[in-house]
Regions:
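A short, conserved alpha-helix within the catalytic core of class I
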Residues: 133-144, 148
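Conserved acidic functional residues
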Residues: 107, 128-131
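Conserved beta-strand signature within the Rossmann-like core of class I S-adenosyl-L-methionine
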Residues: 149-160
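Short, structured coil segments at secondary-structure junctions
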Residues: 99, 148-149
Length: 168
């Protein structure tokens, strides 16, 4: 059962785009996420992070990280007392598991976490986010992530059909 070769295509980036001037498609997706967030408490609650808890813990420990930014955190329930509503696979919030002194949550689609972070963090994690960023905006989003980090970045980019249907 040989798989057919993967069709590769060059991505179309637009170097003129930035946080201050993103593509219209990016702006529309953020608005779509805001609507989806408000429709259900369980929507984008951070559950995709659960399966990476151990590996992130290993990287955070190895790199002696004490501060962390979750870029595209959704509601970020795994960092709060609501962690148990998301998963029974962990017994405390992930920031406690990872031994962090501080953490910051950022998600432009969720008003509670939509304020742009400032400063640097030892670690930046982003799970199941980048596959939704329009290709034209990828460079500035990746630059933004890299400008927040001092020690390590953990990116998980889903390469399978999404469970949620978005306009992207």
């Amino acid at each position: 059962n040989a798989q057919p070769p993967v069709e590769r295509k060059e991505i179309q980036v637009d170097p003129s785009l930035s946080r201050g001037s993103p593509s219209d498609r990016y702006k529309n997706l953020v608005e779509e996420y805001k609507t989806m967030h408000s429709s259900a408490n369980r929507m984008f609650n951070g559950r995709s992070l659960v399966k990476f808890t151990d590996i992130i813990h290993s990287f955070v420990s190895k790199n002696k990280c004490k501060t962390l930014l979750d870029y595209g955190c959704g509601k970020g329930h795994l960092y709060t007392d609501q962690y148990s509503t998301v998963s029974d696979q962990i017994d405390k919030p992930v920031n406690e598991i990872w031994g962090l002194e501080s953490f910051r949550l950022f998600d432009p689609g969720y008003p509670e976490h939509s304020e742009l972070p400032e400063g640097k963090y030892d670690a930046v994690v982003s799970t199941d986010v980048l596959e939704h960023v329009p290709e034209t905006d990828l460079i500035w989003v990746l630059d933004e992530i890299l400008n927040y980090v001092d020690k390590m970045v953990f990116l998980n980019i889903a390469c399978f059909k999404a469970l949620k249907i978005l306009s992207d």
